[in-house]
């Protein structure tokens, strides 16, 4: 796991714990983080934050752009992220926070990648198998990627199950090279 992913998980968990311990709505935190990420997506703001002359004035501008929709805890988060030069991670932090909330609420997000569109019967079998595996509510997203040639890739949390033809061919190629 990369250090950025570790950092994101730590920040997300800290936000989650802050919300719970201060009796704050998780939905309010989702809204605040989404607002912050949306503001950061503005090219002018992004350029200001990424420049070497990033200052307290830029932090104040960023907070002002939140239009009083961010509480004191959110403002403190902005200051901490800015102090640690991590404001650019806000969009990823927002996504990580949502994943963490869903995980604590017993929801697992799963991505199933196939080379072609799957029929309803096959999708039903995959859903049943995944529900048995996780014993939780699951949200399954199906993605088509023709480059995998055939088979499936299943992604959830930090786990990837790669049962694609493409990966098998790569393994075979590596074996043959030695």
UniProtKB/Swiss-Prot annotation:
Q: Per the annotation, which location comes first and is thus the protein's main one?
A: membrane
Note the InterPro entries from the entry.
ATP_synth_OSCP/delta_N_sf, ATPase_OSCP/dsu
Keywords annotated in UniProt: ATP synthesis, Cell membrane, CF(1), Hydrogen ion transport, Ion transport, Membrane, Transport
Q: What membrane topology does the annotation report for this chain?
A: Peripheral membrane protein
- One GO term describing the cellular component: plasma membrane
NCBIfam families reported for this sequence: ATP_synt_delta, PRK05758.2-2
Q: How does it assemble?
A: F-type ATPases have 2 components, F(1) - the catalytic core - and F(0) - the membrane proton channel. F(1) has five subunits: alpha(3), beta(3), gamma(1), delta(1), epsilon(1). F(0) has three main subunits: a(1), b(2) and c(10-14). The alpha and beta chains form an alternating ring which encloses part of the gamma chain. F(1) is attached to F(0) by a central stalk formed by the gamma and epsilon chains, while a peripheral stalk is formed by the delta and b chains.
Per the record, the similarity remark reads: Belongs to the ATPase delta chain family.
Q: What does this protein do?
A: F(1)F(0) ATP synthase produces ATP from ADP in the presence of a proton or sodium gradient. F-type ATPases consist of two structural domains, F(1) containing the extramembraneous catalytic core and F(0) containing the membrane proton channel, linked together by a central stalk and a peripheral stalk. During catalysis, ATP synthesis in the catalytic domain of F(1) is coupled via a rotary mechanism of the central stalk subunits to proton translocation. This protein is part of the stalk that links CF(0) to CF(1). It either transmits conformational changes from CF(0) to CF(1) or is implicated in proton conduction.
Q: What is this protein called?
A: ATP synthase subunit delta
């Amino acid at each position: 796991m990369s250090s950025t992913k570790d950092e994101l998980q730590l920040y997300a968990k800290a936000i989650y714990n802050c919300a719970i311990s201060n009796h704050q709505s998780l939905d309010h935190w989702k809204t605040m983080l989404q607002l912050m990420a949306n503001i950061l997506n503005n090219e002018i703001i992004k350029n200001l934050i990424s420049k070497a002359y990033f200052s307290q004035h830029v932090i104040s501008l960023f907070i002002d752009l939140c239009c009083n929709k961010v509480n004191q805890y959110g403002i403190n988060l902005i200051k901490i992220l800015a102090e640690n030069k991590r404001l650019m991670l806000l969009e990823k932090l927002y996504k990580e926070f949502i994943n963490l909330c869903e995980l604590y609420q017993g929801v697992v997000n799963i991505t199933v990648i196939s080379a072609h569109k799957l029929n309803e019967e096959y999708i039903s079998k995959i859903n049943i198998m995944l529900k048995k595996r996780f014993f939780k509510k699951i949200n399954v997203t199906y993605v088509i990627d023709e480059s995998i040639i055939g088979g499936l890739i299943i992604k959830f949390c930090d786990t990837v199950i790669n049962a694609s033809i493409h990966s098998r061919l790569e393994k075979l190629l590596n074996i043959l090279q030695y």
